[in-house]
Amino acid sequence: MSTRAAKVLAERAIIESIYGLKVRSTEEVQDMVAANFSGKTESKTAATIRGIKIEEITYDSSKDIAKATASIVLDKFTNIDGQEMNLAGKLFRRVAFATSTPSQAGPVQAMRAAEIDAYKQLAKRVVGFTLESETTVENYILTSDVVKSKVLATMYLSEVTEYGWDSDGDAFVKMVLNVKDVGDILGLDVVNEEELIEVEGMGAQIDDFRQAQQD
């Protein structure tokens, strides 16, 4: 069961890399206190594709966690924005993890959270975001401070360069977008100060912000 699930999730990762996904995110901080932080990121994708190969599957029986590596080589493909991409035989490879034991799901769920956070960070860097701020000072004392940010974008052709977990079990995913390559693939003259945009997404097994609110 774990290996089958890992295969499907690896296929999803391939589709998100090539076809792309929609990312919607909101973040809010109140009164400059980290415990008052709230953030939510949602993603969505749907595409028809053929030719994905499962290169390798490994299974850790002690943790009931499976890892699947998927790859595909494509010449042309239409992305989420309806743009035809000339991929010229480019190889895409992604991995995914899954488990059939709920008690072991924490690490793999944290990894997915880190992946989505990386997509959000890329969207903020590439497309931009909207920020709203309201501050009130009464008699020289700060009485209210609210900052909100919003992101809504489609992302595609990003690549994962590194991933893993730290000693606390929190996950990280390093993701990169080669702006020049994207321009060449789309046949567009993309102007950007950075040719290579790199971000690192983070994912946790425990909601530290919610715990801080309860303390």
Write out the residue ranges for each language-model feature.
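Domain-level marker for long, solvent-exposed, non-transmembrane regions
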Residues: 1-215
